[in-house]
Regions:
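C-terminal nucleotide
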Residues: 2, 39, 47, 52-65, ...
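Structural motif
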Residues: 211-213
């Protein structure tokens, strides 16, 4: 706000989800706040410009060990494939999905709050340290998960939501192996129970929410 030279204003924020869920709330909040402040000054920012500014605040100014995906997802929206380049550029390409695929996702994606909330910074910092230290296993894991992302894009654009669910399961297994703090026995039990009762795949979202992809069959 100081860099924006905004006149004295009062800001009040309300949220339906608790802090520490890891659902990208900090990136979304920063992006939305910047958009509101620039809008107050009657200045329009392009989506990419807004996302980069939000990244600057969180990563450069606040020193948070986060990536750019949350800010870009908040600024651009929709189902989008993001490519993060070595030179710090970000390319955003909207997925080409049929209406049937969108309806299928709406019907079968369920988000459960596990009751756990924490800061994801510790896990992300550990991951960032290993990556920058050229940890072979971590780099191999990240490259494989990147390929899973491209496979998920192809599955969705071809309308194969079952394959998407299976890829989500594979993604979770690899993500969980990065750190002992990524999951816990209780969450693992809930995940296994869901898989035994019709879920095709799922993953823990950030630090608290559990996203499960269920089969199209009727569920209780």
């Amino acid at each position: 706000m100081q860099s924006l030279k905004t006149p004295q204003i009062e800001i009040t924020t309300l949220a339906d989800i608790p802090a520490g869920t890891g659902l990208g709330s900090s990136g979304s909040f920063t992006t939305a706040l910047l958009k509101a402040l620039y809008g107050h000054r009657r200045q329009h920012l392009h989506q990419e410009e807004l996302a980069e500014l939000a990244c600057h605040v969180e990563i450069d100014r606040l020193g948070e060990p986060v990536g750019k995906q949350d800010q870009y997802a908040a600024a651009i929206g929709g189902l989008t494939c993001f490519t993060f380049h070595r030179d710090d550029r970000v390319t955003a390409v909207p997925l080409k999905l049929s209406m049937d695929t969108l309806f299928d996702l709406e019907d079968n994606l369920l988000l459960f709050f596990t009751g756990y909330s924490r800061s994801a910074s510790g896990i992300l910092k550990d991951q960032d340290t290993k990556t920058k230290g050229s940890d072979e296993e971590m780099l191999k894991n990240l490259h494989y998960v990147k390929e899973l992302g491209y496979q998920s894009k192809s599955a969705l654009e071809s309308g194969n939501t079952t394959a998407f669910g299976e890829l989500m399961h594979t993604h979770w297994l690899h993500k969980k192996s990065r750190s002992d703090g990524m999951s816990n026995p209780k969450i693992d039990d809930w995940y296994d129970l869901a898989m035994q009762n019709g879920a095709i795949g799922g993953k823990l979202v950030g630090a608290g929410g559990c996203l499960l992809y269920t089969s199209p069959s009727p569920r209780d």
